[in-house]
Swiss-Prot record:
Species for this entry: Borreliella afzelii (strain PKo)
Catalytically driven reaction(s): nicotinate beta-D-ribonucleotide + ATP + H(+) = deamido-NAD(+) + diphosphate
Molecular function as annotated in GO: ATP binding; nicotinate-nucleotide adenylyltransferase activity
Name of the protein described by the UniProt record: Probable nicotinate-nucleotide adenylyltransferase
Family recorded in the similarity comment: Belongs to the NadD family.
Annotated keywords: ATP-binding, NAD, Nucleotide-binding, Nucleotidyltransferase, Pyridine nucleotide biosynthesis, Transferase
Pfam families: CTP_transf_like (PF01467)
GO BP term, pick one: NAD biosynthetic process
Pathway: Cofactor biosynthesis; NAD(+) biosynthesis; deamido-NAD(+) from nicotinate D-ribonucleotide: step 1/1
Gene: nadD
């Protein structure tokens, strides 16, 4: 089986994440896509007011009608700081005989050599680089596959900022995720009294 791994904070998951997963499924003939929400990523802050449960609930809602997309909570279970090499080790234990593809955006790939044990990552999975902010392909000494995906210019941080400032986001999120955010009052500015 050909399995793609997409790690991220998913704070919140948005249509860009789902669109990229569909592109990967098509372009690489993927059988299964695993979304792995990070517990405490090394390269960004999660932010206040949004729990791990909230992020997983939103992912479940976003993926509920996708028969090839699943959630793996190995980083959540392990807790603490999340390193990609540890995530891959966890996934490889579950999928010993499958071909694994780790998908990262070019924004992260540009600093891939500074990650914990990048050579082991690149040698233990097929490293797939997706366009996120750069139209040109970045060069690297690490073995990788570049996919020519379409860039959807949205980010979770932009969505959080739009919600906090009262701007519409309905076209950026799966409906169930939007409803969950509204029902749970997530990402709104807290007013001090």
């Amino acid at each position: 089986m050909r399995i793609a791994i997409l790690g991220g904070t998913y704070n919140p998951v948005h249509i860009g994440h789902i669109f990229l997963a569909k592109e990967i499924e098509y372009l690489l003939n993927i059988d299964k896509i695993i979304f792995i929400p990070t517990c405490n990523p090394t390269h960004k802050l999660i932010g206040e007011g949004v729990s791990v449960k909230n992020r997983i609930d939103m992912l479940k809602l976003a993926l509920k009608n996708e028969n090839k997309m699943f959630i793996d909570d190995c980083d959540i279970i392990n807790g603490g700081i999340t390193y990609t090499i540890d995530t891959i080790s966890c996934v490889k234990k579950k999928y010993k005989n499958d071909k694994l593809f780790l998908v990262i955006g070019d924004d992260l790939f540009q600093n891939f050599d500074s990650w914990k044990d990048p050579q082991s990552i690149a040698s233990s999975v097929d490293l797939v680089v997706a366009h996120r902010i750069y139209k040109e392909r970045l060069k690297s000494s690490f073995k990788h596959i570049y996919i020519d995906n379409k860039i959807i210019p949205i980010s979770s941080s932009e969505i959080r900022n739009r919600i906090a400032n009262g701007f519409p986001v309905s076209y950026l999120l799966p409906f169930g995720v939007l409803k969950y955010i509204k029902d749970n009052n997530l990402y709104v500015k807290k007013v001090n009294v």
